[in-house]
Regions:
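Glycine-rich phosphate-binding loop signature in dinucleotide/nucleotide-binding domains
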Residues: 1
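N-terminal Rossmann-like NAD(P) cofactor-binding module of classical short-chain dehydrogenase/reductase
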Residues: 4-7
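Short beta->alpha linker loops
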Residues: 9-10, 93-97
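Glycine-rich phosphate-binding loop and adjacent beta-alpha segment
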Residues: 13-85, 117-120
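A broad detector of short, well-ordered amphipathic alpha-helices
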Residues: 16, 96-99
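A structural signal for short, well-ordered beta-strand elements
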Residues: 39, 91-94
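C-terminal capping/lid region of NAD(P)-dependent oxidoreductase domains
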Residues: 77, 84-91, 99-120
Length: 120
């Protein structure tokens, strides 16, 4: 057995590993290439595992299907309000420490979202 759905924003070696551990009839969602290496797809694994590899480009999806995009965002916000999902927040910074927030992101000291708070 393996993973039914894999969300891959990294690419490179992570993509290669994902293809090896995906379940029969699984779905691999290609989100980005943070590793800096765009992986090459070995189509024999797609055949043997009966899986699908799907590119997910939010900007183009939002442009082509704005109604569905709005509905998806509303559904997500409803789940947040109902407590069904909770975004992982790694760090909080006041606006005055925006440069420190960027340094934390660039040095990969964060594991979730970074929030910058603006005072009214």
């Amino acid at each position: 057995k393996g993973a039914d759905v894999i969300y891959d924003p990294v690419g490179g070696d992570a993509f290669d590993q994902s293809m090896r551990c995906i379940n029969w009839n699984g779905r691999l969602l290609v989100i980005g290439f943070a590793s800096g290496r765009i992986a090459e797809l070995k189509t024999n694994l797609v055949l043997l595992k009966g899986c699908s590899v799907v590119g997910v480009f939010w900007g183009e999806f939002a442009r082509r299907t704005p109604e569905k995009n709005r509905a998806n965002f509303q559904a997500m916000l409803d789940m947040v309000e109902e407590g069904k999902i909770k975004p992982h927040v790694s760090m909080h910074f006041p606006l005055e420490q925006g440069a420190e927030a960027m340094k934390a992101l660039l040095s990969r000291k964060t594991t979730g979202k970074v929030i910058i708070t603006v005072k009214e």
